[in-house]
């Protein structure tokens, strides 16, 4: 009876050989895995833990000498300061330098501009006019005196037809009676002229007439 059902199952297709089942089971095992090449295992990309960048440390700089910087700003180099100095017009000497005195003995009025130029260069001038005619000498004195007044200079007579003219930067003083006075403080002596008295009077004449 069992053989009949077995044949019927084989005929219909329900009955499969046991070997086939066994092979199928084996294929489901290790042999099944051998049919396809094994794929290499792909490692998941792991994000490398990069260390956070450390903040850059400030550079150690040598301390700046502030006093030196201040002194350099306040006191520029000597060459630079000398190049930036603008001299006064007509001034050839620095303040505090040795004063220069020029002695001139002109022979004509045409030489007077040289005296004015020397005063503009802040030089003192001793003017000796003894070599000039009296009228020319008086004209020369008036001319130089006017120019000296315009530059705030000083003038003084120091001898017969000899005059001293100085710029405003020169202080001239003289000693009289043991006391020192500036030339501009010495009062000018006033000369009063009057006719000389006659050696004889009218009284003797009256007596002679008698």
UniProtKB/Swiss-Prot annotation:
Q: Where is this region: Disordered?
A: 13-78
- Which segments show compositional bias classed as Polar residues? 64-78
Looking up Pfam families in the UniProt record yields:
SepF (PF04472)
**Which residues fall in a compositionally biased region of kind Basic and acidic residues?**
47-60
Bias (Acidic residues): 22-31
Task: Report keywords, A-Z.
Answer: Cell cycle, Cell division, Cytoplasm, Septation
For biological process, the GO terms are:
division septum assembly; FtsZ-dependent cytokinesis
Gene3D superfamilies, per the entry: SepF-like protein
The record's InterPro entries line, in alphabetical order, gives:
Cell_div_SepF, Cell_div_SepF/SepF-rel, SepF-like_sf
- Indicate the principal place this protein occupies in or around the cell: cytoplasm
Q: Name one GO cellular component term.
A: cytoplasm
Enumerate the subcellular locations listed in this protein's record, separating them with semicolons: Cytoplasm
Protein family according to the UniProt entry: Belongs to the SepF family.
Q: Quaternary structure per UniProt?
A: Homodimer. Interacts with FtsZ.
Described function: Cell division protein that is part of the divisome complex and is recruited early to the Z-ring. Probably stimulates Z-ring formation, perhaps through the cross-linking of FtsZ protofilaments. Its function overlaps with FtsA.
Q: Please give the name of this protein.
A: Cell division protein SepF
Organism the protein comes from: Cyanothece sp. (strain PCC 7425 / ATCC 29141)
Phylogenetic lineage: Bacteria, Bacillati, Cyanobacteriota, Cyanophyceae, Gomontiellales
């Amino acid at each position: 009876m069992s053989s009949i059902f077995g044949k019927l199952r084989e005929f219909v297709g329900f009955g499969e050989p046991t070997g086939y089942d066994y092979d199928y089971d084996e294929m489901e095992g290790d042999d099944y895995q051998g049919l396809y090449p094994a794929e290499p295992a792909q490692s998941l990309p792991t994000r490398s833990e990069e260390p956070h960048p450390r903040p850059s440390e400030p550079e150690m700089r040598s301390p700046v000498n502030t006093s030196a910087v201040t002194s350099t700003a306040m006191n520029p180099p000597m060459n630079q300061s000398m190049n930036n100095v603008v001299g006064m017009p007509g001034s050839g000497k620095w303040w505090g330098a040795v004063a220069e005195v020029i002695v001139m003995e002109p022979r004509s009025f045409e030489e007077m501009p040289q005296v004015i130029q020397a005063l503009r260069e802040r030089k003192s001038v001793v003017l000796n006019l003894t070599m000039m005619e009296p009228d020319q000498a008086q004209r020369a004195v008036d001319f130089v005196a006017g120019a000296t007044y315009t530059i705030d200079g000083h003038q003084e007579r120091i001898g017969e037809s000899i005059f001293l003219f100085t710029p405003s930067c020169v202080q001239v003083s003289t000693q009289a009676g043991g006391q020192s006075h500036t030339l501009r403080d010495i009062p000018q002596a006033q000369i009063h002229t009057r006719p000389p008295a006659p050696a004889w009077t009218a009284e003797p004449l009256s007596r002679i007439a008698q």
